[in-house]
Amino acid sequence: MKQFKLNAIALAAAQIALMSTHAAHAQSAQSNAAGDAPVTVVVTGQRGSIESAQKIKQDSDEIVDSIVAEDIGKLPDRSVTEVLQRVVGVTIDRTMSRGDPEHYSVEGSGVSIRGLSMVRSELNGRDSFSANGGRSLNFEDVPPELMAGLDVYKNPSAEQIEGGIGGLVNLRTALPFDFKGAKVGISAQSTYSELRKGKWSPSGSVMLSNRWKTGIGEIGALFDYAYSESGTRTDGFQVEPYYPRDDIEPGKTVWVPKGTQWRTLNFDRKRQGMYGALQWKANADLRSHLTYFKSKYEMQWDEQALFAASNPYNIGLRPGATYSPTGALLTGTMFDRVDAGINFGDDTRIANRKSDTTDISWNVTWRANDRWSFTSDLQRIKARTHGLDSTVATGVQMPEQQIDLSGNVPSLMFTDAQRAYLANPNSYYWAFTQEHLDRSEAVSKAWKGDAKYTFDHPVLRDLRFGVRFTKRDSVNENSNPDFNWSPISQTWQLGNNINNLAWLADPRFSGATHLTTFNNFFNGKANVPSLVFPDTSWATGFPNSYAALHEFHNILCAERAAATGQAQNCATWSPAKFGGNPAGINEQSEKTKAMFGQLRFGFDDWKYPVDGNVGVRYVKTEMEARGFTNFTPPTVTIPPGNTVTGPAVPTIPAFSADQAYANSYHNVLPSLNLRLKARDDLQFRFAMSKAMSRPDFKDLQGYATLTQDIKLTNFIPERRTVIDSMTLTGEGKGNPLLRPTTATQVDLTAEWYFGRASSVTVALFNKRLKDVIVQQSYDYQIPDVNGTMQNFTVTGPVNGARGRATGVEIAYQQYFDKLPGALSGLGVQVNYTFVDSSTKPYNSTFSAYCSGGNTASNLNLNQNGCDTNGRGFGDLPLQYLSRNSYNVAILYDKGPWSARAAWSWRSKNLQGINVNGTKGGDGVDTNPASPTFGQHNVGWALPLWADDYGQLDASLSYQINERTSIGLEAQNLTDAKAKQLMQQGIGQMGRAWFVSGPRYTAQMRYSF
């Protein structure tokens, strides 16, 4: 660390000295510099941006697709994530996070390229990331108003930084010398959400840039600021997983969910960005720029949700229920055969998060002579985030639920009496609280030095080589307990430590609730009953509000103790907090050292000219992690004097200690890019390379819990004990010894450019992945009392599978200039991507019958999925990968008018296997050989899929004069429904339906 700082200071001092040396020559150099053209000419307008992006693709040394801002601060969508989905081969998720599919994201979230989520993110060709336990940027955190464009590299060269098997996304900002002189850009927008009526969200940006000739050369300065708010609402229906039931319809098995539920969520976010750049050019040979980039993201959502909480095997059906051909319930009236009603929880949940990323970078480029040039680049980036997730729930026993699951969306029917019952606060009781806190910080420092030697040769063009050094420290911390679920009053506690529930009808427990009427639910397409929810203040008031609620439980507990004369049997509530458990802390330190060499060449005198580059990148990665391993010996009872037989049982002392882990590996990454020019407008590319993606930091946590499980039988009369079995197992939250996933990738393209904004391109690709990270077992050893090493089989992330992604990308764009009159402004953009994938574990974990609980150690469940009838699935594709996706955009640019209507669609994709809402531990054991056959004790986890989804967006702008334009934008014009499917033996069953409604934006722009 100290050496890195000293080197950085020395480098900076050397660069300042270099600038000072050239100051004396600046006056004579100014006359030469005055005639220099700016590095980049900013294009304006939709057509101009398409032309510029096509030119980047056509001239690039690598396979790349680009999007260029139409004007200052004007990318074609409201978020970087939504912009990326327009690129061929790129898809985005529609949930807030990949671990929580129950909450919809209006602006999109995780990005995949060619079906792979291992995507590297960069800002101006440098590392960029968020403090989220991963390695990439949360693109939704970045203000699109600060971007000049973005590039998506599909098969990067040796010169580019390693780390993205799926691809590389480089976000580009402007520099002062990109403009000929002074430049000002101002924009203002306001967005209206149709579903969240009455909510207007302002946005705006301002950019100032200028350049001056001085005594030490030309100097430029640029300042850019963006502010954006978004307020949206999402409504959702959900159906619980289906359970096999042989006790409802005589003589046959039918599949019945335990309920249908609904929710509504209001989401608010603020996004700010600040960017500044200083640029200096002493003469034609020496230039430097210093940039500062800061993005801040704040979000808060509050949700009112109903969820089924009954025992699924207590659910009964009134006569007249109907079923699908596979036996799944279609229509019927449900009731609870044991309790007074179907148990539901209805919660008020809030989540808030603040995140920021700060990047400071300094670049110096020096051309020593006609042959040699050198570049030095220094960067420091810091990312932080912290959040609170807080839930307070009441409970209600719904008398009945009449459902119709035969249509596109679940339909619910309630009588007036049932609606009145659900709207009455006296029907509810206080149920539970749950909170989670997290905070993370990551700091990275990087320096790279590159050199280029330009040949005077008919074939060899230049040789590029360089080195790069980085150091990144990361700390991710979760509260202890992680998600602290704490009961206030539950039906299963009755007769145990309480005699009554904490009913709101009891004056001691009343108040601070409200009636949610679900106005305009599903944009008026569904009529659900009003429900009583806790006030939001209970959730936002953590921890004091929680303490007050858990006093209700203490009152009930003391009441039972007084009535029975027994001692109180109630646990004291404690809030989740940081510290106290090393399982919540993940500290990582990583250093990388890389070098590369790349030769560019061109056979221009061939009949069909060929050019390209060949190179190799070598990188060494050194990782250190702070960890913790815990082992508590089991307690076994063997009567004194018994003879013990069976397998030997080692005596292992209690073990609980901090662990220091170190891991290092190196990768050699060759690459080849070739381009054949059949004509000036027709070219073909071939690219082949080896790529790598390092494990996410969250997967590298060095925490493990070890368990010694001894099963024995005591034979009392015979005075003997038989050890039936002894196993040494464990669970790891991560694995600090993970290696990167690697891939060999091949691309072949054909590109026809038949106009300035007109082209047809086709790309074939094949990626072969090795060491894909999956949940499997690895060995861990600790000594017993005799010093003999004992081997524990620990379940955690390992490099345990190989994979494949093969497909094709097709893109077409054209303006129809030859059409008559106003029609000559019409244009079209179309692209389509097909991806086929597969994974194969090194060691198969599939079992036709599931067993065990819903834990990390259940490999069959976590990798293959298990149904509620205890049967495994297997044969699942790579997650987040859609086999088909496409974009269609109708464009218009004529005179002052510019318009676009864009449709984006992707086919269904696997979101997860063991995720919230579609997992449990009460599946049926259907294995005939199992001693618990027929019991409800098997862990289950359903593969959850996002169904096909398409969305229509549109924009219209009018250029009032050279400086001013006005416009309208619309997102999700067709009010699309996002649907989720849960895979079960009876088919792909509807799990959830989400709507967020259209959004409309009015905007004005001014620039000169």
Name what the model sees in each region.
Residues 197-330, 352-363, 368, 672:
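Transmembrane beta-barrel wall of Gram-negative outer-membrane proteins
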Residues 81-127:
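Extracytoplasmic beta-strand/coil segments of soluble accessory domains associated
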Residues 110-111, 126-154:
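Short acidic/polar hinge/loop motifs at secondary-structure boundaries
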Residues 42-78, 131:
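N-terminal periplasmic "start-of-domain" segments of outer-membrane beta-barrel proteins
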Residues 176-182, 213-219, 285, 371-373, ...:
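Short loop/turn motifs that connect adjacent beta-strands in outer-membrane beta-barrel proteins
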Residues 483, 487, 904-925, 929-932, ...:
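C-terminal beta-signal and adjacent terminal beta-strands/loops
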Residues 349-357, 692-761, 767-769, 788-816, ...:
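Outer-membrane beta-barrel signature, preferentially recognizing the C-terminal barrel domain
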Residues 765-769, 773, 778-780, 784-915, ...:
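Gram-negative outer-membrane beta-barrel transporters
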